[in-house]
């Protein structure tokens, strides 16, 4: 039988700079509410038979120490090659004690990772190097991690095509999207949970604003939607959360979602 997601943890809910932003004294960056502290965007999913990491940014080490999770990671789904989504891959080293870890990405991202981390992909690796290998995937072509079905689909990060992922029947994860082609919307029917990016109030050339994310959420119509990849320009979590419709939420670091 196919496996499905039953639990997910938001490891990081922030944009590329994180929140607080270094040197900023705005009310969000100086807020005492822990929900206003945002590490770079990443999530950890538990399905019936797999543990799956989505993106592995520069805060990955700190995120895993916070959740105190040390177990086999069955696969890492990479959305795109920007540093805030792949900068922590070297920190997978302790998790390689459980065995080699497959890294799933499109070919463009895989090419960048080979260039950026060549030492990980040599035939004769130096001891202590992460035991990871690349698996290239394409939008619309499903694959499995153990018995958990994954469907990659294309979203547009400004002009850069990147990947979103539907994991099992119930959950989909999208980050860094500005727009999405029609065929991707067709892959996203009947979702229990949608995780999607909402950067800030004002429009941005490569990321959805909060109002654009609300339109996307409405169109997809998941039972619950969680926004991620926020900057300090979204305002205080407590204030911004009150303005959202029912069943739409701002995620925060450490948030657990049971399905």
Identify the function of each model-found stretch:
Residues 1-6:
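Short, small-residue-biased leader/transition segments that mark boundaries at the very start
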Residues 7-13, 53-55, 149-155, 170-176:
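Active-site-proximal beta-strand elements of phosphoester/diester hydrolases
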Residues 45-48, 145, 165-169:
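Active-site beta-strand termini and strand-to-loop segments that position acidic
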Residues 106-161:
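Metallo-beta-lactamase
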């Amino acid at each position: 039988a196919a496996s499905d997601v039953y639990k997910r943890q938001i490891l990081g809910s922030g944009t590329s700079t994180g929140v607080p932003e270094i040197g900023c004294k705005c009310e969000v960056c100086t807020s005492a509410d822990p929900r206003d502290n945002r590490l770079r965007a990443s999530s950890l999913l538990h399905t019936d038979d797999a543990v799956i990491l989505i993106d592995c940014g520069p805060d990955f080490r700190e995120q895993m120490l916070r959740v105190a999770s040390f177990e086999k990671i069955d696969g890492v789904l990479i959305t795109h090659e920007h540093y805030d989504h792949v900068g922590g891959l070297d920190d997978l080293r302790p998790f390689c004690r459980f065995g080699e870890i497959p890294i799933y990405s499109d070919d463009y991202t895989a090419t960048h990772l080979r260039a950026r981390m060549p030492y990980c992909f040599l035939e004769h690796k130096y001891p202590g190097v992460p035991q990871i290998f690349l698996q290239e995937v394409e939008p619309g072509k499903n694959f499995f991690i153990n018995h958990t079905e994954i469907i990659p689909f294309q979203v547009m990060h400004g002009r850069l095509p990147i990947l979103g992922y539907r994991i099992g029947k119930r959950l989909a994860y999208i980050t860094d999207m500005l727009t999405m082609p029609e065929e991707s919307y067709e892959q996203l029917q009947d979702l229990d949970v949608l995780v999607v990016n909402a950067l800030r109030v004002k429009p941005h050339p490569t990321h959805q604003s909060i109002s654009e994310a609300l339109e996307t959420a409405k169109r997809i119509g998941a039972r619950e939607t969680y926004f991620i990849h926020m900057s300090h320009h979204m305002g205080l979590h407590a204030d911004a959360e009150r303005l959202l419709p029912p069943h739409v939420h701002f995620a925060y670091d450490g948030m657990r979602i049971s399905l």
